[in-house]
Amino acid sequence: MKPSLIEKLKTLTYRYSEIGGLLSDSTVINDQDRYRELGKEYAQLEPIVKCFQQFQQNEKAIESAEEMQQEKDPELRKLAEEELEQLTLKKEELEDQLKLLLVPKDPNDERNVFLEIRAGTGGNEAAIFAGDLFRMYARYAETKGWRVNIVSAHEGEHGGFKEVIARVIGEGVYSQLKFESGAHRVQRVPVTESQGRIHTSACTVAIMPEVDEIDQIKINPAELRIDTFRASGAGGQHVNRTDSAIRITHLPTGVVVECQDERSQHKNKARAMSLLQSKLLAAERAKQDQEQAAKRKSLVGSGDRSERIRTYNFPQGRVTDHRINLTLYQLDEVIEGDLDPVIGPLIRELQAEQLAELSGE
């Protein structure tokens, strides 16, 4: 392992010990916010420190085995050789574990998200596909124990959605769904197609982490136009005769958000503002990402496949994720919400890239 990584691990071990002392300090205990913050940091450092302690113990055992190899007794030397072989394998395993533990965590991974699906090219068939995608994510959320609340929806003429925005609430939602942003393409014979021809349609999916108060972008109320209207469409069980639904337009950017899920205008406004915050923050992050991507592109050339991240081919029962050249003939299972076979490889690919960067430092 590189000396720079060893130094980093020693620094983290010192910090872990320091926090351990602070957590028993009465001043810290009485400050609930600080105590909670330090407790969280302590819990994050613990697996790294425990693994590093095992690594250090293993290093000492390797030193002892190497010393034993110098013994005159051939039996002792043979024992030392066998032990050294096992310890070297263990060292490699521990190094891999430590590198994985040192990979920077995405600060948004534990957040709830706003899921936005928009029908793209393909007219009515695209809207039907948007409905299929929404059901796929809703079923996936159900298997994970997450909750899905529709914030706003505009239904298609023949079913599905022209646009649907939902809030997905649960543990580690963003960590799993963050790979879903992009264009999703479907190839199938539409119900309305009499000639049996395969049509291609597309939808765009956006996954936006919900914003904490700390991260919020300052919004000038004078730059907002707020309209009220009667709730309709999805969430119709809450429809009433008052204009409880809210539409907010952020005038400088033209971003428009709606919420018609809650019974009261006040709650709808609060939810719409939360969605607006997430959209504006996502736009700001996207701008930063584009700037970074432009710099990278100038160095390594274009490899961007974000225009079309995944294809769902119904005649062949095939799902292809174009970012990692993954092809699965499990379309029925995937569209029914079994997304782990798709998301798992994407997570592993990201970890492999991060590990390669870490090893190259």
Curated annotation (Swiss-Prot):
Keyword terms of this UniProt record: Cytoplasm, Methylation, Protein biosynthesis
Keyword Ion transport carried by entry: no
PROSITE patterns cross-referenced by the UniProt entry: RF_PROK_I
Pfam families assigned to the protein according to its UniProt record, in alphabetical order: PCRF, RF-1
Localization of this protein: Cytoplasm
Keyword Cytoplasm in annotation: yes
Modified residues (N5-methylglutamine): 237
Superkingdom of the source species: Bacteria
Function: Peptide chain release factor 1 directs the termination of translation in response to the peptide chain termination codons UAG and UAA.
Name used for this protein in its record: Peptide chain release factor 1
Gene: prfA
